[in-house]
Each structure stands twice: as structure tokens, then as C-alpha cells.
């Protein structure tokens, strides 16, 4: 059980100066990266476009989790790398739906693949949380459902500026305004961090790492 001092510290760190600066940097990255991807040199080359787009998803996932955990913490960077992997790996469902490893087939699908349904996110997160509770992994891996939520949500929000959000079984929304994508992406780590505090996850993470968390 976390002490009152740990609880107070975790609450104060949800909006520290460092994390606010980091999230502003994340917003700026979104602005610049997605504008650069519009260059004709990238758009005219399928491989370059696909790899660049996926790389941006990866960086946003890594950056978002770094904001949550604190970029100055003395733990391994494996979590941040894992967050980037989770944010980018979603796109493999393009190849599953295409039934082929052909990039051309993956980019010309008749419909959106299943991992791009936003309803999947809470289902997978809650299933993961239940599984961790069942196998008593909830302390050592308490961060994993939150990491998955942030990584996948950031991917869906970014895709939403082109295609809208696909919310099964209700259909899809209109494409998201670019400014809304930037605001949601840069504020999502803080929202999750605060909810993690309310659920006690931040305190468990602080105890696990043995250092302060700078968010």
C-alpha cells in the first residue's frame, strides 16, 4: 500500500513542468512530422510512405509513454521501446486482411482491418487487466494495460485524421480535425497519468522502479 507521501507525490507529478514541456514537444512533433509526410517524394513511393507513417506512429507511442513514466527516471528504456512497438505493430493487420505480404495489397484493402476498430482497445485492455489479475501479475506488470491503451489510442487518433474513428458496431466518425488530433495526442499521457493515480497504478510503478516518476 502506498504511503500518503507517495500518493501526494504521484498526484503532483501528473502535471509537472517537465512533463508539460515534453507533451508540448510531442504536439510539435505531430505538427512537423505529419506535414513532412505530405511531401510528394514520400507520397509517391509506397514503401517510403508506409515506413515513414509507421515510424511516426512508433515515435508518438514512445514519446507518449516517456511523458507518462518520466524521461529522467533511472529504469530501463525497454518500456518506452515496447510502447513504440505496440503503437506501430497494429498495422500488421493490413497484411492479415490482404492475405498477402504484398505492400500494394496491404495498402489497397476493401475495408479497414480489425485492429483499426477502436472498440477493440477497451476490450483488449480489460481482458489483459483481468488476465494479469488472474495470474497475480498486476503489481509487476501494472503498467502494461495503460501502455497498450496509450499506444493503440494514439495510433487510432492519428489514423482518424484521414479515415475517422471506426467504432464497432456503430460505424465510423468523420475525419478528425488536425488540430484535435494534436491536442488529444499531447494531452492523452496526462489524462492517463491522472487516472493511473486515481487507480493507484502510479504509486505501484514508483515502488517498482524505486525512483520518482517525473510526470
From Swiss-Prot:
GO-annotated cellular components: membrane
Record bears the keyword DNA repair: no
InterPro entries reported for this sequence: TMEM267 (IPR026572)
Keywords: Membrane, Transmembrane, Transmembrane helix
Record bears the keyword Membrane: yes
Topology of this chain in the membrane: Multi-pass membrane protein
Protein name: Transmembrane protein 267
Organism field: Homo sapiens (Human)
Amino acid at each position: 500500500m502506498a504511503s500518503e507521501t507517495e500518493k501526494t507525490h504521484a498526484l503532483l507529478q501528473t502535471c509537472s513542468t517537465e512533463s508539460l514541456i515534453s507533451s508540448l514537444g510531442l504536439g510539435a512533433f505531430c505538427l512537423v512530422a505529419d506535414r513532412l509526410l505530405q511531401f510528394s517524394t514520400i507520397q509517391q513511393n509506397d514503401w517510403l510512405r508506409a515506413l515513414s507513417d509507421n515510424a511516426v506512429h512508433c515515435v508518438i507511442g514512445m514519446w507518449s509513454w516517456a511523458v507518462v513514466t518520466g524521461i529522467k527516471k533511472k529504469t530501463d528504456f525497454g518500456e518506452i521501446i515496447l510502447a513504440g512497438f505496440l503503437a506501430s505493430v497494429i498495422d500488421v493487420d493490413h497484411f492479415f486482411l490482404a492475405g498477402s505480404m504484398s505492400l500494394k495489397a496491404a495498402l489497397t484493402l476493401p475495408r479497414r482491418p480489425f485492429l483499426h476498430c477502436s472498440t477493440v482497445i477497451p476490450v483488449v485492455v480489460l481482458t489483459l487487466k483481468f488476465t494479469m489479475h488472474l495470474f497475480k501479475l498486476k503489481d509487476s506488470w501494472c503498467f502494461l494495460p495503460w501502455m497498450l491503451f496509450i499506444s493503440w489510442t494514439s495510433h487510432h487518433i492519428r489514423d482518424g485524421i484521414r479515415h475517422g474513428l471506426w467504432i464497432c458496431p456503430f460505424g465510423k466518425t468523420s475525419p478528425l480535425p488536425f488540430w484535435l488530433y494534436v491536442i488529444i495526442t499531447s494531452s492523452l499521457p496526462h489524462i492517463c497519468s491522472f487516472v493511473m493515480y486515481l487507480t493507484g497504478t502510479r504509486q505501484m510503478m514508483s515502488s517498482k522502479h524505486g525512483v520518482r516518476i517525473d510526470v
